[in-house]
Amino acid sequence: MSPSTTTIFIGPILAVDAAVSHAIHTAAKPFLPPFVLLLLEISADFRFSFPVSLSFLLSPPLRSFLVPFLLGLLFDLIFVGIVKLIFRRARPAYNHPSMSAAVSADHYSFPSGHASRVFFVAASVHFFSAAAEASMTGPSYSFLDGWIRDHNDGDVKVEVVVVVWIWATVTAISRILLGRHYVLDVAAGAFLGIVEALFALRFLRFDEMIFGR
């Protein structure tokens, strides 16, 4: 497909996406709680989420989840960066870097790295909970285990899964409200995050190799 043909098909879609995204941002701007939205931005930043997740390795029963999870976070960072370099879609013109709590590592908009990351986290927790790994049915080793585990069946507590999904959804929407991304950027990022979670939990399970039994 030639560049001109691509423009004919993609151009109108991007134009509608930009118009809808700007309308949402403009309508919501007077009511936005900047402090809360910036906290959401920080919570989903890789430089915050990765070290925090890394510290959870102190809980042995969680390692079967955390090893593919941490590798998945790294994969997400690299893969989304490559996709951004391929598409090179500029961020919205009304995006104000001065309002950002996190220093942006790039100037490209598609897909949203924050959206992919938070949906990767939410999907990973959800899928791991549904799988009910055998290693999670053992005795609790720390306060952390008791906080997130349901000792009736060893699974991750439903409340934790629900809270993580709510956090992911609100954070993803905040990217549009803050003017960081367009709607399609966030939708694509969310989709990639879920696919990456499936990939990580299936193909990046090296916990036995790293920690042994």
Curated annotation (Swiss-Prot):
Subcellular location: Membrane
Keywords annotated in UniProt: Hydrolase, Membrane, Transmembrane, Transmembrane helix
Main location: membrane
Major enzyme class: hydrolase
Its membrane topology: Multi-pass membrane protein
Regions annotated as coiled coil: none
Protein name as it appears in the record: Probable lipid phosphate phosphatase beta
A Pfam family hit: PAP2
Ranges that cross the membrane: 30-50, 67-87, 118-138, 158-178, 181-201
Family membership: Belongs to the PA-phosphatase related phosphoesterase family.
Organism, scientific name: Arabidopsis thaliana
